Amino acid sequence: MDAPKAGYAFEYLIETLNDSSHKKFFDVSKLGTKYDVLPYSIRVLLEAAVRNCDGFLMKKEDVMNILDWKTKQSNVEVPFFPARVLLQDFTGIPAMVDFAAMREAVKTLGGDPEKVHPACPTDLTVDHSLQIDFSKCAIQNAPNPGGGDLQKAGKLSPLKVQPKKLPCRGQTTCRGSCDSGELGRNSGTFSSQIENTPILCPFHLQPVPEPETVLKNQEVEFGRNRERLQFFKWSSRVFKNVAVIPPGTGMAHQINLEYLSRVVFEEKDLLFPDSVVGTDSHITMVNGLGILGWGVGGIETEAVMLGLPVSLTLPEVVGCELTGSSNPFVTSIDVVLGITKHLRQVGVAGKFVEFFGSGVSQLSIVDRTTIANMCPEYGAILSFFPVDNVTLKHLEHTGFSKAKLESMETYLKAVKLFRNDQNSSGEPEYSQVIQINLNSIVPSVSGPKRPQDRVAVTDMKSDFQACLNEKVGFKGFQIAAEKQKDIVSIHYEGSEYKLSHGSVVIAAVISCTNNCNPSVMLAAGLLAKKAVEAGLRVKPYIRTSLSPGSGMVTHYLSSSGVLPYLSKLGFEIVGYGCSICVGNTAPLSDAVLNAVKQGDLVTCGILSGNKNFEGRLCDCVRANYLASPPLVVAYAIAGTVNIDFQTEPLGTDPTGKNIYLHDIWPSREEVHRVEEEHVILSMFKALKDKIEMGNKRWNSLEAPDSVLFPWDLKSTYIRCPSFFDKLTKEPIALQAIENAHVLLYLGDSVTTDHISPAGSIARNSAAAKYLTNRGLTPREFNSYGARRGNDAVMTRGTFANIKLFNKFIGKPAPKTIHFPSGQTLDVFEAAELYQKEGIPLIILAGKKYGSGNSRDWAAKGPYLLGVKAVLAESYEKIHKDHLIGIGIAPLQFLPGENADSLGLSGRETFSLTFPEELSPGITLNIQTSTGKVFSVIASFEDDVEITLYKHGGLLNFVARKFS
């Protein structure tokens, strides 16, 4: 099916770009003054509507509704044609299997199967198939800064238990187990080992990234998933518009952001904004790059691939104005968390958020994409940052050519999609405007005993004094007033030092769960560089350490040139596992310990970890503060938390000049520049090389290149589905539903997980019996999610949820009654009997049928069971669309009526005739075997849905188009 012809009704808007490229584009800004006040995100929706307006799937009325967004928001549904689709392997399998099956159907109908291709660019990332079978579970030694391999940290061994693990964000392997091995059975030995084994948490310890481990895991991955990988490789060969990113390359969201994003699309010399929908939960991240995108279900992405739009309610758009300048000591993490916290408090659920104002230019692309990625935290559909100069600078660093960037900028400015701080005229109008003054976001620390006790850095000195005075409790230490100024002298390494209340004795820079943003680690390194150059040092008795979360952190600290300066201040790399923050601290010197005991001093530990409970770092260190990495370095240099950074110096330079924190604190611009040059560029180059080179196993993987896929009849993962078995060249007239039995009588809020569970396959289920009969053991069953490419498994798994409550049964169970025989059977077995007897089926349900996550098999499964219609009080809209898309009629009780009020038992048979001229919302009559007649609503909303239903669903509709 060809993509819709470019805006037949709006050809008069086509212009030629005023540059050397002479590309064409739709100048939507010529639609009038209404366009000028639209939010940027709505302008992207409008451009797509204009470009794809064909009078059927996209009507002129839809274009006008978007243009009139100000009055139509939240009231109308509009279609949207995204520029591209992003799939992961789990959701990609059923979509590509359907396309492969469609080729078979088109050939059967006498058409050319080679015409069957996705209608838009489709990228499929294989990043959900890796399981960790081999790992190393000891704390790793630091790499040699001068080069050389990592020292081996543990014995490579296959794990005894191999649960399915999804890849962790931003890496191709999951962090390993913290299990240190089989403990001895002797109780004394067991107790001793517990006391002496480092406590490792799964968020911090990673498998050793040595070739031996990676290669062994990849070898198992390719063996375990060979069928699927061969199918994906065949798909990438025969389908135009399909690109497969092989396993071992990276995470879907990382690849989408750093490699697949175009910002501006070019197709047949026509320019238009990049946009994307996909099944990756991190899809919203690209909005930070000025690319409109959000997550949808598998069936929606497949619909887009088949040439149909996604549908959305025209959203409210909350304008978030960023003003002021951030406090010089504020880090990127402070800003990101401050903004997301504010959005959560305001309430933006189900809305678009769009950022504007002078403060936006202070946010790096990393900041923006992080905020955009945190949409689930505050409930927004997406958070959009229009393209600006910061975006272009980032794209320059990630490989875009100068000519491409110039063309991009010219186009975006021509259609008023480029944000310019210097030109505030014609600012968009928003549903609501909220203001966040970046000055209001202040740097803070947490402590001295609990993570939730936040203290602004400006209040640190007074707060610590208050803690000394307060009674012993969550914050207090109850130190007598006359002892609060006590000083104890110590001799250490030939010099004399003085300790007092507030003295820092432990300082640890840790890149872990809450400080993995590169900018804060680089800020710590840049601060260390400036401190060393100013002649500042950390007192030698302070236990300093640097624990990167991964080798990547070490790489960019080294490549940016700041690692030697951290080392100069004593922040040497100690390892890559949990250490300081779980209490695995090197012991303090005897001199310090004796001084603390002698003066009963409240000394301090300061770290950039996530736990600071009293005594956690060391029994004798009573005050522990969590801080950003640069603040850890700053307090270590100061040697005390009892300091006001605004008025008191950190120390003096060799000439005796006072050096204050503001003298050595790196600016955000400086940090962003180094981040772009030494992190973003490095990561992009590594990713690009990986994708373009592939890997040996993928490159050598044999796969067919035939027009039709050679289905393996023995395969339990990939089968040619039966959706097209009865497909005819032309759609036949709508058939009456005669004497249909009720397969299931369900209540309210039946979810898609009740209908099509995605979890493990129960050993006593119909799917398990099918797999067992094909020689598989229970350990080899895998999950329903992994077998989405096998319709036989998925059909047997339909309504197989053990929590399904069928009123015929009276208790939760995946069972029903086969009424002709009176038997209680598995749902699949009953449906199979009905089909053999030629009896059509319907489902009775209550309110919100099909709620929960979008799931394609929640519609496909019932269809293959023989369900012709669902009769419910109300539907989750997305699921109702799915039912129509597969050819099941969504019928709805009249308002105020339901099965109970009509006296239906579900044991009757039901008959229904469709009129020749079916129209949206038409009322139909159902007659039961008891003689009762009642009216229902055929819940079709427009002519497109009726057309799809008459064709027997979306797949049949498209197959006929191709044939």
Curated annotation (Swiss-Prot):
The keyword Metal-binding applies. GO terms for molecular function: 4 iron, 4 sulfur cluster binding; aconitate hydratase activity; iron-responsive element binding; metal ion binding; mRNA regulatory element binding translation repressor activity; RNA binding. Its cofactor is [4Fe-4S] cluster. [4Fe-4S] cluster binds at residues 512, 578, 581. Keywords: 4Fe-4S, Cytoplasm, Disease variant, Iron, Iron-sulfur, Metal-binding, Neurodegeneration, RNA-binding, Ubl conjugation. CDD domains: AcnA_IRP, AcnA_IRP_Swivel. It is found in: Cytoplasm. The keyword Iron-sulfur applies. Its main location: cytoplasm. InterPro entries: AcnA_IRP_Swivel (IPR044137), Acnase/IPM_dHydase_lsu_aba_1/3 (IPR015931), Acoase/IPM_deHydtase_lsu_aba (IPR001030), Aconitase/3IPM_dehydase_swvl (IPR015928), Aconitase/IRP2 (IPR006249), Aconitase_4Fe-4S_BS (IPR018136), Aconitase_4Fe-4S_dom (IPR036008), AconitaseA/IPMdHydase_ssu_swvl (IPR000573). Interacts with RBCK1 isoform 1 and isoform 2 only in iron-rich conditions. Interacts (when associated with the 4Fe-4S) with FBXL5. Interacts with CIAO1 and CIAO2A. It is linked to Neurodegeneration, early-onset, with choreoathetoid movements and microcytic anemia: An autosomal recessive disorder characterized by severe neurological and extra-neurological manifestations. Clinical features include early-onset global developmental delay, absent speech, dystonia, spasticity, choreoathetoid movement disorder, seizures, and microcytic hypochromic anaemia unresponsive to iron supplementation. RNA-binding protein that binds to iron-responsive elements (IRES), which are stem-loop structures found in the 5'-UTR of ferritin, and delta aminolevulinic acid synthase mRNAs, and in the 3'-UTR of transferrin receptor mRNA. Binding to the IRE element in ferritin results in the repression of its mRNA translation. Binding of the protein to the transferrin receptor mRNA inhibits the degradation of this otherwise rapidly degraded mRNA. This is Iron-responsive element-binding protein 2. It comes from Homo sapiens (Human). The gene is IREB2.
